[in-house]
């Protein structure tokens, strides 16, 4: 069982006053959605080029922890392209120099590609970047037709050239004085979340099956009186495994929110939409924002099954806990 060899002692995750999660990159953008309680939508002043956000196939979220008067932003993932990430951060008025840390969910290009060149625009300083050591591997998806989708990994030298302090870790990591938890490898315990069977990675001996994508990791925040907020890039470990692993790591059973990709799109994963949704209903997740690779069918099933918890994610949306 992947992850079972890692120590899973309860982690001392400091509770915070609140957290704001801003969707910086996602597959979907809609500037006409209305605010709802705890959810603020981006409002464009006009349809000129200056203040328009862009969507792309990728994910990035700004996770801003609130403790007293202090606001501490962490960038989780960087989307696919520098053009989209840089533009959206500018439009959303996010000062790059205010970032406290960066976390990469896994080594697929649609989660790290946007970081290229980003920090050359800001004053030179060292910024920690947490990444799993398997994220450097070259990957690809092989379709039933024989077509291949290459997934270029990040390059350590390029990240360090940006002024980033690369922190490789398989296990969990605490950031911001114990207020943000990076999960590290996710323990796989469900019977139905079996990985990505057409996913491959290059090793010294050539290409080999890599269905488990062991570098998949998420960030977890514990909000006082509300519970855990989990932000997950693709949930290649399985969204239910991600949820249960967060509970196991922290000892907290209340889930205030789950934001990010469920990777339930396509014929391989659609058969597990049902048990995934059932598990989230049973967990009584407070808010759910199924983004990026969740897939049209899964999004609609989640919306129907959890109407009070469901929030349609979109680039520029800020959800507060």
Please give the residue ranges for each predicted region.
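Active-site metal-binding loops of divalent metal-dependent hydrolases
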Residues: 25-27, 78-80, 107, 134-135, ...
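Active-site metal-binding motif and surrounding structural segment of the metallo-beta-lactamase
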Residues: 83-131, 250-257
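Conserved beta-strand hairpin/beta-sheet module of binuclear metal-dependent hydrolase folds
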Residues: 26-30, 35-92, 212, 216-231
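Metallo-beta-lactamase
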Residues: 134-217, 281, 311-320
């Amino acid at each position: 069982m992947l992850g079972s060899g890692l120590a899973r002692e309860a982690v001392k995750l400091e509770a915070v006053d609140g957290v704001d999660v801003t969707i910086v990159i996602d597959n979907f953008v809609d500037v006409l959605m209305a605010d709802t309680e705890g959810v603020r939508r981006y409002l464009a002043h006009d349809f000129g080029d200056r203040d328009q956000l862009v969507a792309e196939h990728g994910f990035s979220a700004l996770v801003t922890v609130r403790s007293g008067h202090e606001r501490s932003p962490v960038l989780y993932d960087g989307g696919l392209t520098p053009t989209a990430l840089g533009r959206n951060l500018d439009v959303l008025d996010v000062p790059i120099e205010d970032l406290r840390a960066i976390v990469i969910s896994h080594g697929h290009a649609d989660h790290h590609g946007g970081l290229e060149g980003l920090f050359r625009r800001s004053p030179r300083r060292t910024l920690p970047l947490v990444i799993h050591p398997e994220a450097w591997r070259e990957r690809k998806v092989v379709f039933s037709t024989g077509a291949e989708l290459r997934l270029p990994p990040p390059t350590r030298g390029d990240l360090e050239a940006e002024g980033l302090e690369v922190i490789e870790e398989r296990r969990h990591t605490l950031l911001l004085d114990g207020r943000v938890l990076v999960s590290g490898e996710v323990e796989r315990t469900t019977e139905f979340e079996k990985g990505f069977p057409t996913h491959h990675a290059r090793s010294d001996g050539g290409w080999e099956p890599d269905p488990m994508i062991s570098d998949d990791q998420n960030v977890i925040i514990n909000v006082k009186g509300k519970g855990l907020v989990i932000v997950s890039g693709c949930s290649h470990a399985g969204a239910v495994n991600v949820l249960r692993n967060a509970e196991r790591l922290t000892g907290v059973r209340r889930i205030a929110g789950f934001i990010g990709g469920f990777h339930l799109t396509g014929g391989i994963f659609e058969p597990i939409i049902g048990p995934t949704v059932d598990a989230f209903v049973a967990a009584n997740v407070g808010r759910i924002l199924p983004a990026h690779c969740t897939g049209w069918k899964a999004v609609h099933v989640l919306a129907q099954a959890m109407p009070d918890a469901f929030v349609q994610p979109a680039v520029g949306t800020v959800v507060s806990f």
